[in-house]
């Protein structure tokens, strides 16, 4: 495979990095969330040498991945042929904020409440490639 430069970063571009395959998500080189064959992600072998999975099996893999994400607290925003858009609230470190509130005599509690009320929603799309790997893609 050719060496990629910053200009070669198109969503869906694959790269071998630190002993496993990664894919450009639009923001970073991301690991696959799930895979039909996880061992393939750790082999430095061209993807074109593997057989492509049937569309029905890829759709089922995507459904399973979405179910797992929903169980972890995500919500489904949109489903399309391109993939499934999920949303998840940013996590708040309640233990750290609780300690800071105790150390500051309750003053930090106002900051803690403000953070909890204004936390952002992270959106991302899960899409499946022809070989059964589920990849996150940055949602706008």
Which residues fall in each region the model found?
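A composition-biased, non-transmembrane "mature-region" signal
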Residues: 1-104, 109-140
